[in-house]
Structures are given as C-alpha cells and as structure tokens.
C-alpha cells in the first residue's frame, strides 16, 4: 500500500496548514515539529511577519501594533496562498526582525505541504478557505511571557523591559484580533505550567515540563486506530517520572470537541505504537521523537498527536479528491 507522502506526490496537489497565535506563543516550535516528522523535502513554511505593511518605525508613528489587521497585507497573503495551492511560485516579502524593516522579496516555491504561521491566518474568510487544516496555539500568560522574553532578548536584540512593555501594549489588540481566531481552528493547543512543580528538583536546571491541552473538533471522517501503551510496571518504579493523561468531551464555541490533557513527561515506550503508525502511514523512517532522552514532555507528545491529526486530515483530503475526480 502506498504511503501518504507517495500519494501526495502523485496527486500533484498542494495542501496548506495554518498555525495561528500570538507572537512568542510556540507556533514555530509546532511548525518545526510537524516539518521534522513529515520530512524536510515534503514541507515548506513561512511566517506572516513577512506580510507586515508597516515597519517598526511606521507602527510607532501610527501608534499601531503588528496585531492590528491594518498593519498587515492580508489580501496579498490570500493571493499568495491561492497561488501556492495551484502549485505556483511566489515572490514572498521578507521582514528583517533585527532592523524592524522590510527587506525586499525572495522567490518561494510550494512543497506538497505548506505551513503558514502567524497572527492572522484565519482572520478573513478568504484566508480560511485557502487553509486545509487550522491550528491555534494558546499558551497561558505566564508561559507566553517566558517564551517571548527568551526569544526576543536572545534572538532579536530586545531588552527584557522592552519586551514586557510591548506585551502589555499588545494585549488589547491580541484579544480583539488574534484570540478570536481560535473559533475557526480544528485544533487548539493550550499550554500551561505543569501541575507537578512540587516534585521538580530544588537545584540545577528545571525540566522543560508543561501541561498541554489539545482541544480537537470531532472528526467526521473515520480515523485509524492508534494505541498509547501504558506499562504499569514502569509507572510503579520509583524512577518513573510523573505524568497524567485525561480526556473529556465538551462544547467549544458551538462545536463538539474532544479534549486531551497531557502533563509531565512520558516514557518513550508509551508512544512507540503512535510513532510506528506515523512511520508506516508516512512511509518514512525519519526521527519522530527525540531519542536522546528517555522521556518525552507534553509538548513533544502534542506534536506527535498533531502530526497524526495532520496525516488523518491528509488521508481525508486525498480520498475526497479521488471521489470528486
């Protein structure tokens, strides 16, 4: 049986995944994880930051934040996504974060899967129609603050007090223009501090532990069975790390959803079947999880589950394409 990747190549189609969320919310982490698992040759990605219509100086003069739709070329982005879906290359604008200025354009050609990440990928109906699978990343204020300070100070040359001031300035526009987009997402990824803080080490670096809640729209199409193997003997050993997994049904902005919450760190053996299913489905032997560590944190598991959802969505879209041809 042909793998999903082989079938996508043969179909000649281009599929677009959108990842929405605030600046510093972890969108790129999710995007890189999906790209690594699906394969570098199968996926290309870009940031909506490249579609700013105002540079940093102009935004300051106009007293407008990048989160305001008027500070972005949303129609141009829609034009480009529609062109990419047709297999056409584009001249994509480039935004230089180090200078806060536009830096011309660069050629950008589609791969079989295109990931667009940014503040407003679901803001207009035209954009939503151009995106096949929509993910919204929604960390808590404390997690987002930590990640944004770490990124903007370490990678973009800001001072910590500048980042904190910007976070406060942006909050109203985030609520008005970005947060609202999660009602259109098929998957919402909520990231919070772990509840296992009391058991974390008192000295040395703190483990990268989080609590991740995956809010997923109930799939209409049938999905492939996948097991999470739980070995009770491992759980009862004193060396076993703490973790929790829970699932519930709920309504989310008028949609029926399933909510899976993962916290702590999970042993690699528990995700072996999920990894095997992904490898078989994708037709790849690429590294799925980080084998340097015996345990996978909640974000790593969320990336696996997200990618499994992506493959199921691709299966559905490929099948629908055959039915309509």
For each predicted feature, which ranges?
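Conserved lysine of the Walker
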Residues: 27
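Conserved nucleotide-sensing/catalytic segment adjacent to the nucleotide-binding pocket
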Residues: 41-47, 53-101, 113
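Conserved beta-strand scaffold positions in the cores of enzyme catalytic domains, especially
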Residues: 43-45, 134-136, 188, 259
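Receiver (REC) domain switch/active-site residues of two-component response regulators
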Residues: 49, 132, 186
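Conserved nucleotide-binding/hydrolysis micro-motifs of P-loop NTPases
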Residues: 50-53, 121-122, 140-144, 194-196, ...
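ATP-dependent NMP and nucleoside kinases share a basic, alpha-helical "lid"
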Residues: 105-152, 201, 207-211
